[in-house]
A protein has these predicted regions:
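Signal for well-folded cores of large energy- and translation-related assemblies
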Residues: 25-29, 63, 85-92, 99, ...
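Accessory interaction regions appended to the cores of large information-processing enzymes
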Residues: 140, 160, 184-191, 220-602
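Short boundary/loop segments of OB/S1/cold-shock single-stranded nucleic-acid-binding domains
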Residues: 195, 206-214, 391
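P-loop NTPase switch module centered on the Walker A-proximal segment
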Residues: 1-98, 102, 142, 210-213
Length: 602
């Protein structure tokens, strides 16, 4: 029987997890090197490549010195915490990757805490030691202190540290002596990470992840914790609430390199994919046919935020997308629930609306962006934070926020955060930059990143993670400016936009199609202003021919999806179609809006 090591790679966002896995793949000669250099093999979803972040957990295996190493790449963002937790169930040890300059960041702490609670043995990899001003030795001390504070035991604190640069493709036990390969890291994995315990008995496997194939449907992925599975075997599927279904394994696959290989039998401790099981959910157990014993299901963090999803009912409905009806929207959200653990969906107040609960703006905006690329048209409301009543008191989610800014912008960063009910808990200079740590309500994070980047000339590094529920902190002021709202449907005309430049900043370019009720700009004052930017210049013979002035308009402000979601107010929606994104009022008719606001004033 082949020796196996199961290992998960955990780290803060963008410290180089996926690049490191790529290096391991090259080391094991799974890919011819020159052709794919420079692009990540594992982040194979368009969105992941564009944003440079890992969203979905992935499995790969490499053979080194005759030992099979199963590598699981995990996402670093706490918004995808649901992914991290279920993946750690499959691993025996973790590779903790830390940036040699940035050190331990909030997300490092978030993922490490989960691994330590599960009793996993860590190996610390200090990456990017080729960067100027890096401080590998200090970072190693930081990691030790962090593990100690998180309550690690002696076995976990006695960790091995490997230094290197995944990008340049070397690892070494001493950062001052570069090598020419990452072999030292692979040797450390073999010596430090325990082989999975072989437990004889009836089969048991916890389904920790799932894949989808257009040919065979849903495939269950997990690690066999006891016994062995054989292709064609009859098994029991143990679901929640003690429901047991009798089923049959049609096909078994193990991970080999970047793909999968069919096998007849999988031994205890290996990670495998099972085909032919219907109606399973993540957290179910595959157990013996006659005496089923279920494993405890996976506990996932609760959602902290909700958003209204509804079909697109604007005047431009159906011009852009393929899937536009509420039936399409409902089916797509149900399909997403199958694999997205931290998501919940409930029907909204009307038949064509749904309330979607998630872990944060990033988590939900990745879903919206994926749907947009698939050809969906939909509208999304302002994100709402979920409150809880604890002991008769209204409580809201609080996050730990860390901001790293150059010294001259510290005052601005503190002011922006405290205005949003943030409390400064720690401040530490790091070279010419300063690290600020706050406790801040989740509500206060909306729109915070764009404000901080503007105030710090794009230099701020922002990260946050959920901490706990605390008593409600009071109202937070939202943006003060009203909107410029179009009252006509047609094309935006430069002539009339030029006349309204002193009233605010525009979100649309001349020539763009707009409709009545669309938000076309930000007003300089507090109230909304209804404007007509579809008016053309009257061409009569009275005017002198040469008196036309050249119109110079400032460029329009373009939002990303997250920025738009954080920008809108309660009476606005973001309309998302495959080729456009617009902000609109919920009530398109100006008279209906006026009646509504008069009623609220009364």
């Amino acid at each position: 029987m082949q020796e196996i090591r199961n290992i998960a790679i955990i780290a803060h966002v963008d410290h180089g997890k996926t690049t490191l896995v790529d290096r391991m793949i090259y080391q094991a000669n799974l890919v011819r090197q020159p052709e794919n250099l420079g692009q990540l093999i594992l982040d194979n979803n368009d969105l992941e490549r564009e944003r440079g972040i890992t969203i979905l957990a992935k499995n790969v295996s490499v053979i080194y010195k005759g030992v099979k190493i199963n590598i699981i790449d995990t996402p670093g963002h706490s918004d995808f915490g649901g992914e991290v937790e279920r993946v750690l169930n499959m691993a025996d040890g973790v590779l903790l990757l830390v940036d040699a300059f940035e050190g331990c960041m909030p997300q490092t702490r978030f993922v490490l805490q989960k691994a330590i609670r599960m009793g996993k043995k860590p190996i610390v990899v200090i990456n990017k030691v080729d960067k100027p001003n890096c401080r590998p030795d200090e970072v190693q001390e930081e990691v030790f202190d962090l593990m100690f504070n998180l309550g690690a035991d002696e076995r976990q604190l006695d960790f091995q540290t490997v230094f290197g640069s995944a990008k340049q493709g070397w690892m070494s036990m001493d950062w001052r002596q570069p090598t020419d390969s990452i072999a030292p890291l692979l040797d450390t994995i073999l010596s430090e990470i325990p082989a999975p315990a072989i437990i004889e008995g009836t089969p048991q496997m916890l389904i920790s992840s799932l894949e989808y194939s257009p040919y065979v449907g849903r495939i269950a992925v997990g690690r066999i914790t006891r016994g062995e599975l054989v292709s064609g075997q009859h098994i029991s599927l143990c679901k929640r609430y003690d429901i047991v279904q009798k089923q049959k394994v049609k096909q078994l696959m193990v991970f080999e390199g970047l793909g999968k290989a069919n096998v007849d039998k999988v031994e205890c401790g290996d990670i495998c994919a099972v085909v032919g099981i219907d109606g399973f959910e993540i957290g179910d157990t595959i157990a013996d046919f006659e005496n089923p014993e279920a494993l405890p299901p996976i506990a996932i963090d609760e959602p902290t935020m909700s958003m209204l999803f509804t079909i697109n009912n604007s005047p431009f409905f159906g011009k852009d997308g393929k899937f536009v009806t509420s039936r399409h929207l409902k089916e797509r959200l149900e399909k997403e629930l199958e694999k997205n653990l931290a998501l919940r969906v409930k029907p909204g107040l009307t038949a064509d609306s749904f309330v979607v609960y998630g872990r944060g703006v990033l988590h939900l905006s990745v879903l919206i962006e994926t749907m947009r690329r698939e050809g969906f048209e939909l509208q999304v409301g302002q994100p709402k934070v979920l409150d809880k009543t604890i002991g008769g008191q209204r409580c809201e989610p609080i996050e730990e926020l860390s901001i790293e800014v150059p010294e001259e912008f510290v005052g601005a960063a503190i002011e922006i955060s405290t205005r949003r009910k943030g409390a400064l808990v720690h401040m530490e200079p790091r070279g010419d930059r300063t690290l600020l740590e706050f406790e801040i309500p989740t509500r206060g994070l909306m729109g915070l990143r764009s404000n901080l980047l503007t105030a710090s000339q794009g230099e701020a590094v922002v990260a946050h993670r959920f901490k706990e529920y605390q008593p409600y902190k009071g109202e937070i002021e939202r943006r003060n400016n009203g909107s410029l709202v179009s009252i006509e449907t047609g094309e935006a005309i430069a002539y009339s936009m030029n006349k309204l430049l002193d009233r605010g900043r525009f979100f649309v370019e001349p020539g763009e199609p707009i409709y009545g009720g669309q938000v076309v700009g930000e007003h300089t004052r507090e109230r909304d202003l209804n404007i007509n930017i579809c008016k053309t210049k009257k061409l009569t013979n009275v005017r002198a021919a040469g008196s036309d002035e050249k119109i110079v308009l400032p460029p329009a402000i373009k939002f990303s999806l997250e920025e738009a979601l954080e920008y809108i107010q309660e009476d606005e929606l973001v309309e998302v179609t495959p080729h456009a994104m617009r902000i609109r009022k919920i009530l398109l008719d100006p008279l209906a809006r006026k009646r509504n606001s008069d009623n609220e004033d009364c």
